Design a protein with these regions (language model features):
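Amphipathic alpha-helical "coupling" segments that flank catalytic cores
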Residues: 1-176
């Protein structure tokens, strides 16, 4: 949903009303990291202030940030990230300020067929699998919308959710 609208032409605010939302030169940064509201008076200032307020506006830059971070995180685990381009695209548009991190899951799951593990990882949780020499590792890479502050809590929460998903997958694999 549209919550506010910035509309400028030659540094002047355009008078636009869209479904009761009036245009202005006031916008906001990242919901948790940026300023609540700030004024912009030009396109250049818009990009500059959003960047300072933890919003990477350029989707191509955001996508490359995610790609590069995921590759580096996987390397730190001694593996390679399985970068599904459709998933990468989806995550790019789910976050404003991406920070990739890794999580772990029980090694018993890597004995299952790869798709049984990677499907809930990718389809339900939006995680990237990590492999080494074509074999799945008991790790995943997730992308947080924010900085690395308290990433340990974010990691623990993501691991907990994936454990439940994988337990379900294991159950259905054995039942079917």
């Amino acid at each position: 949903p549209i919550r506010w609208m910035v509309a400028l032409l030659n540094n002047e605010v355009l008078d636009i009303d869209l479904e009761g939302i009036k245009s202005s030169n006031i916008t906001r940064g990242h919901r948790f990291l940026g300023e609540k509201e700030f004024e912009v008076n030009s396109v250049e200032e818009y990009f500059e202030k959003l960047d300072k307020n933890f919003v990477v506006l350029d989707q191509h830059k955001r996508k490359e940030m995610i790609r590069e971070q995921a590759i580096e995180v996987a390397k730190s685990l001694g593996g390679e990230v399985e970068l599904d381009e459709d998933l990468l695209e989806e995550i790019t548009f789910l976050v404003e300020y991406p920070t990739a991190f890794y999580g772990e899951f029980d090694e018993e799951y890597v004995k299952l067929p790869k798709e049984v593990v990677t499907t809930p990882m990718k389809e339900h949780q939006r995680y990237f699998p990590v492999s080494k020499d074509g074999k799945l590792l008991p790790n995943f890479i997730a992308v947080r919308n924010g900085d690395s502050n308290r990433i340990d809590l974010v990691k623990a929460g993501n691991e907990k959710v994936l454990r439940a998903r994988l337990a379900d997958a294991l159950f259905f694999y054995h039942e079917d």
